[in-house]
Amino acid sequence: MSDIWQQLSAHRAATEATPLTDYFAQDADRFARYSASAGEMLLDYSKTALDDTARDLLVQLAESVDLKSRIAAMMSGAKINSTENRAVLHTALRAPKDAVIEVDGENVVPGIQKVLAQMGAFATALREGSYQTKTGTAFTDVVNIGIGGSDLGPVMATLALAPYHDGPACHFVSNVDGAHIHDVLAGLNPETTLVVIASKTFTTIETMTNAETAIQWLKGALGEDVSTHLAAVSTALDKTAAMGIPDARVFGFADWVGGRYSMWGPIGLPIMIAVGPESFGEFLAGAAAMDQHFRDAPLMENLPALLGLIGVWHNNICGYGSRAVLPYDQRLSRLPAYLQQLDMESNGKSVALDGSPLPRASGPVVWGEPGTNGQHAFYQLLHQGTQVIPTEFLIAATGHEPELAHQHNLLKANCLAQSEALMLGRSWDEAREIAIARGFDGVDADRMAGHLSFPGNRPSVTLAYPKLTPFVFGQIVALYEHRVFTEGVIWGINSFDQWGVELGKELATRLLPMVEGADASQKDASTRGLLAKLST
């Protein structure tokens, strides 16, 4: 494999000076040859510096780590999360009902389907008003309390699927900062609000702190017994029972589902409440279709594999340590934040599976904002900054508002213009002509030409799809899940643990008494100084 890395680096050195526009000039079919589809979803990667040699080498790299076998191992229930000795089966949560997927000799699919049916029955009763409040009325609002994977996915999904909302309004609380829960609850009526507490162990400090606050809020209006207004997503039935939540309203999931991969099951309860079991099922079906594509499509035509290999090319071969995800879809405005956890918590690792230091960079910094907002914020740096940041555009052919089709056309024009501008740039000579046309001449025109020129040659990919439906949204999220997996396999890391979050939590537990006045003399000078400054 080291030989392939060397060949990739040598090829990059030999072709780095080639403008992207030359690839199109030399190949009239470049778009067709450097794009791939999964159903009606298209990935255009023609505006990257890949040529046939680089792409072939990247595919060889994937083959050298046996990516296809690793995909099969993950989807069949092998315990590929080696540091925790766990299977990794978020794909099973959206598998067909008749699938057979075994963990320790037991088919997990019937259990998944049973919980999904329980979720559907509860969501339907809540939506139809047959499951009622303590005072005998219909619930109007749902507050989901969770953090990390228990929050980011459902928050993103309920916004993405807003056109399909026909259930109670869903609200989300994650931050332990009291301002968050205060502001969410301030606009709600406790008499018609259901609180869903999402914590697998029921020990997550932020979630349990917010849960206690919410319960006290409910009790202030309803009296001591507020169990009717509570549901939970957890496996800790003893703890949920102690909080007064009956087992019938506790939805559990196994330890082979990681938090950041969990919204396809019980963590997705608020999504199902918002859009209904049928639309939630379409969301699962879209993800399942992408799972099948990832498992079966040849690497050269495989969207998640290609996106992962492009990420490796940009990160490890080109030295671009950041990537911007730019959805030209306002309802995907939470996608970049979701991908930050999915990508950076999965692949932000510095050791290989055997515990040895990695020989090369792993996960990049992932960030972004929806277009066209970002154009009026950070695109300046994308176009003219000293760092090259690969960009990933997402755009639908049509929106959900036919009466506003002219605005969607403007959105599409902006998206395509940005990817074109990043590639083309503007030469110094062209910039000087513009300066002259604006009234500058001589030295002033030369000076302005530097400001008005764009280097171009900045890579981007575009993901295009017909419309942001539940099915398509499921495809998009699963695509990015599998892209992360592809990159993790290439780098030889475990993408399914997160030991890096532990130390800060441990120190926070020890620091809390000091924040409240206990002796801090053994702490470092900076921490002592900050404790003194923040003391109340």
UniProtKB/Swiss-Prot annotation:
One GO cellular component term noted in the UniProt record for this chain: cytosol
Protein name, as recorded: Glucose-6-phosphate isomerase
Gene source species: Ruegeria sp. (strain TM1040)
NCBIfam families reported in the protein's UniProt record: PRK00179.1 (NF001211)
Recorded family membership: Belongs to the GPI family.
UniProt function note: Catalyzes the reversible isomerization of glucose-6-phosphate to fructose-6-phosphate.
Keyword Isomerase found: yes
Gene this chain is encoded by: pgi
Entry EC no(s): 5.3.1.9
Pathway: Carbohydrate biosynthesis; gluconeogenesis; Carbohydrate degradation; glycolysis; D-glyceraldehyde 3-phosphate and glycerone phosphate from D-glucose: step 2/4
